Amino acid sequence: MRFMRVAVFGLCMIPAAGVAAAQDAPSVEAQQRTLRTVTAFAQEYLDRIPNFTCTRTTRHMVAPAATQKWHDQAVAAYELSYYAHDEHYRLLTVDGALVKRVPAKSMAEGWLELNGNFGWILKELFAPGVHPHFAWDGWQRVEGKRAMVFSYRISLEESHAKQAVCAGRFFFHSCKEKNYGFHGLLFIDAESMDILRVSDTPDNLPSNYAQGISTVDYGRVKVAGEEYLLPIADRIQTYNGKVLFRNDSTYTAYRKFSAESILKTDAP
């Protein structure tokens, strides 16, 4: 099984559910102001994000659904180049060995592959045209930082998100796409207003498509002396029948792909 996401996206607050979520909550006006600030930043980010190349290192794991005892399939390193508002992958190594494709023995129990995390979720949440429903969800800490947490939901009718099941051994080829709605959580640094983490869970998908949760962590990364807000890690966990799959990835060795526009992530 292989899994990809392709995308192209207002702002709507709904009341938070439950007493716990309302405790110590900022005023509705403060929540709306925070979301407006983040939306404005994200829309500029998507319009002006420079082209980059980095290394994505993914630990592929699998487990029987009955026991949930995880074991490693492989550790794969990919060159990820981001340009023309799209991701381009090249497999570098599997378990440290130079290869052009994932060995069949590593894929014997199935194989989960994901693209789209570099800019996908921010585009879905914040680009004009879709109106996610936000609700206050509480406070949490992300890597020691106090984060404002909002739940969100995008309906199938409004969503442009797509997921694909791909048949061939080559990544992201021979794929059948399906449109879906989704929901998740948005974590915002209470001081800097940086986006720290976004999670998403698909809705409305047939059983043969990936059913699970994906989380992307963002951090400030210096590239050529400039600072950018970029993905630093992600996790996806899903299942296919009686088998669970999990990918834990890190993004390192960022460098400029080409000279383009510059987006600094100074706090508003």
Task: Annotate each PLM feature.
Residues 6-17:
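Bacterial N-terminal signal peptides
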Residues 22-183, 190-196, 201-214, 219-268:
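Structured extracytoplasmic
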Residues 1-4:
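N-terminal secretory signal peptides that target proteins for export/translocation
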